[in-house]
UniProtKB/Swiss-Prot annotation:
Localization: Membrane; Microsome membrane
Active site (record annotation): 681 (proton acceptor)
Native source organism of the sequence: Arabidopsis thaliana
One Gene Ontology molecular-function label: protein histidine kinase binding
Annotated pathway: Purine metabolism; IMP biosynthesis via salvage pathway; IMP from AMP: step 1/1
Note accompanying the cofactor annotation: Binds 1 zinc ion per subunit.
Keyword 4Fe-4S: no
Protein name per UniProt: AMP deaminase
Regulation of its activity: Activated by ATP. Activated by sulfate ions (in vitro). Inhibited by phosphate ions.
Disordered, as annotated region: 40-167
InterPro entries: A/AMP_deam_AS (IPR006650), AMPD (IPR006329), Metal_Hydrolase (IPR032466)
UniProt cross-references to PANTHER family, sorted A to Z: AMP DEAMINASE
Biased composition (Gly residues): 85-94
Tissue specificity field: Expressed in seedlings, roots, leaves, flowers, pollen grains, pollen tubes and siliques, and at a lower level in stems.
Amino acid sequence: MEPNIYQLALAALFGASFVAVSGFFMHFKALNLVLERGKERKENPDGDEPQNPTLVRRRSQVRRKVNDQYGRSPASLPDATPFTDGGGGGGGDTGRSNGHVYVDEIPPGLPRLHTPSEGRASVHGASSIRKTGSFVRPISPKSPVASASAFESVEESDDDDNLTNSEGLDASYLQANGDNEMPADANEEQISMAASSMIRSHSVSGDLHGVQPDPIAADILRKEPEQETFVRLNVPLEVPTSDEVEAYKCLQECLELRKRYVFQETVAPWEKEVISDPSTPKPNTEPFAHYPQGKSDHCFEMQDGVVHVFANKDAKEDLFPVADATAFFTDLHHVLKVIAAGNIRTLCHRRLVLLEQKFNLHLMLNADKEFLAQKSAPHRDFYNVRKVDTHVHHSACMNQKHLLRFIKSKLRKEPDEVVIFRDGTYLTLREVFESLDLTGYDLNVDLLDVHADKSTFHRFDKFNLKYNPCGQSRLREIFLKQDNLIQGRFLGEITKQVFSDLEASKYQMAEYRISIYGRKMSEWDQLASWIVNNDLYSENVVWLIQLPRLYNIYKDMGIVTSFQNILDNIFIPLFEATVDPDSHPQLHVFLKQVVGFDLVDDESKPERRPTKHMPTPAQWTNAFNPAFSYYVYYCYANLYVLNKLRESKGMTTITLRPHSGEAGDIDHLAATFLTCHSIAHGINLRKSPVLQYLYYLAQIGLAMSPLSNNSLFLDYHRNPFPVFFLRGLNVSLSTDDPLQIHLTKEPLVEEYSIAASVWKLSACDLCEIARNSVYQSGFSHALKSHWIGKDYYKRGPDGNDIHKTNVPHIRVEFRDTIWKEEMQQVYLGKAVISDEVVP
């Protein structure tokens, strides 16, 4: 009868199991013999007789028997064949000297034995020469990865000074699991590991065979960031021709003009407040508390559209003189003449292309090193570095789903709230929706119709209509206005919800732009009252004031008679609150949170280029809207004087940060080059290589919004943001209008993610852009010190803290070096560069 197939399989399984168990037993027993012999040698370092000679003799006989049967011990074990009288390692009597049993080492003539394992090139113990520090290495308590750096092994040399010759087998090496300590007399200076070279302390563990797992991941964390060397580009400065020298002198003149115009604080913020411990600043528990300060002796009056400040009523000397309109427009025309010169355009284009290629070469040589440097910074990645939304309008700060949920909740919870006065009748919220033939059930995102679509491209008027939910201006007035029948309570509540979302994210900040129209002087007090009464304060938020350029509309409506009326309505209350804070207490505390002033409207509208001799604001009584640069000058001049006055009284200052270069003429960018700290958009710089190069040299901030531009003026793939970034312009990403543009709860992260996906930005690129956004923002010196490092105001790697920014010193040093080289090129080797970044 033939055996059953299952019986054959069972027999084969039993035989294989028996062989496996036997092999394991022999392997385990041989290993134990080696380990016990090592312990005995350690316990008797001076050659004393072992305590149990019978046991030693029996072990030697077993070892000889094993070697006779199997030839040689397994490759995974150190060679431990008995020493014989004839010097051989096979049979014969066990060799003794003074009663001691010796263990044979691998003959020196044989090559090293390599037994590769996963993630390792070789197994320790194959050679009698090894680095002492590699016997037992600290590893992370969360990972079995050894701390020896894979990159240290490349950098360290194989000199004899770094090597230790171990005679025979070292029991401490065999006990790699930490049961036995390292011998105290074995090169203590090499075994000891300086604590300063470790980022964290780690527990010691390992496996029995001394085979360490792959060390790469943990090594990256153990290494101090930025210890790796990188390839520095060394491109010698070109010797300019005579034509290039003249072009460089023109660029120098433009940069010096800007220095004369832009407001700079007399005492830098880091000199006023020295931050020794950049820990989390204490939250402001009473942001709207007002303490009487009294009125100063200053006196001011408006002359030709610009406020002049005097020490007292009898004084005639202007305390804070500013360039007049004629001088400004003359200098503006000089800049326009420079940017139109053909030879200068050619030179600047060539320099910009060279900047781009230098960065590409830097990435080819150092991208991997930047990546590893980022990995070495514990805790930090793109998600938990500070990012500031440097350009976002408050009326569109929420996404469409958020607004829809809020409207539905109010319609459900407060249907009988009187919300609007229309056509001589007060209407409740329910009556408003009934008049629109809508119910809460009918509402959805599509019906809300606030999202920009194809119809808004090159149609700024249609884009503005998207601020009306369901196409109804009455819903905009109820939910998105602060000066309405309910004193903006609904807008205040949804604003608080947005603040709460920002605070929950912790690492996202915003600078919200809120409108002052200039129709009446009481607008400032109304806005400040709305902010204070609704307790709209967050450590993650500051405010900018935006002025819509709508003079022609107000003139047609009969609200104003001249442009001077708008300037009076905007700036007179600010000077009053500065000279006498008690006269406008709510405005005074609100201005502590205002960091910038913006100009907004459709830049694509045609306008006349201003001449050197323009009418004064009081003389501007025609129905046409003044040119963009006309608005810019008078806002700049009044803000300059206001900031000088506020600085003299120890108050916060307000920078000019308008929309510019989104569309329209290149003149807009020339005017903002002379007067502004940073701008929003700036995509038209792609049309002027000279202005683009000047913006690079001056490091003027550009808060760019590619998704917003994609809906209005420029397709996403044509946006110049990636080119600007490669060339080294000071760019940041912003959202502009989340209500119309974005779809997620975190619009700023959405902006970053789309840019990273489309333009293949690396993690280092994203963190550099986020760092730029903090520099451009108007947050306090204390907060910036906490967010990006206490020395953030210093140039180059000295001002970078990778543990806070996650930007490698390699990238920062490259940017700083290239910028300094360009400045020396433009100034013909005579540039005077400050060690501090101009705020």
